[in-house]
Amino acid sequence: MTLSAEDRFAISELLARASYAYDQRDLPLLESCLCDDAAISFRVAGGDLVGPFSGREAMMAVYRDAMESQSDVRRHVVSNAMFTPKDAEVDVISNLTLFATKDGSTVLLTVGLYHDTVRLDDGEWRILKRHVELDSAY
């Protein structure tokens, strides 16, 4: 698969849209970023693997549960995306910087990497797999 500049931009926008949707707690927008058979997994500070949680509904349940436990305002900043096309999918590694604001104070919570696999789904790039690798717990 050859990846055009337009595809790279669309995939970068997908990752930004997913972060924005989570931060704004816009569940319909977040869900629209995911393939039906999407999956998510996590590892914090080299610890045990959590997940994968398979299927869009399971992935959305992970997001909803996380949101319910948070009383602050989150800002997920995605940067430095690198793309590796393979067959009908694209692997994307990007940096994650996570900030939180509460009571007028903003703090850096953690940094890490997103390891995403995206694919075209009904003409739109969507997240098929997401592995979140955090450098530290928060």
Task: Identify the residue ranges that each predicted region occupies.
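Charge-dense, low-complexity intrinsically disordered segments
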Residues: 5, 50-53, 105
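A solvent-exposed, acidic/Ser-Thr-rich amphipathic alpha-helical stretch
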Residues: 27-95
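Short glycine/serine/threonine-biased micro-segments
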Residues: 23, 53, 110
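Short, low-complexity N-terminal intrinsically disordered segments enriched in polar/charged residues
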Residues: 1-36
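A beta-strand edge to alpha-helix "cap/lid" segment located at domain peripheries
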Residues: 68-138
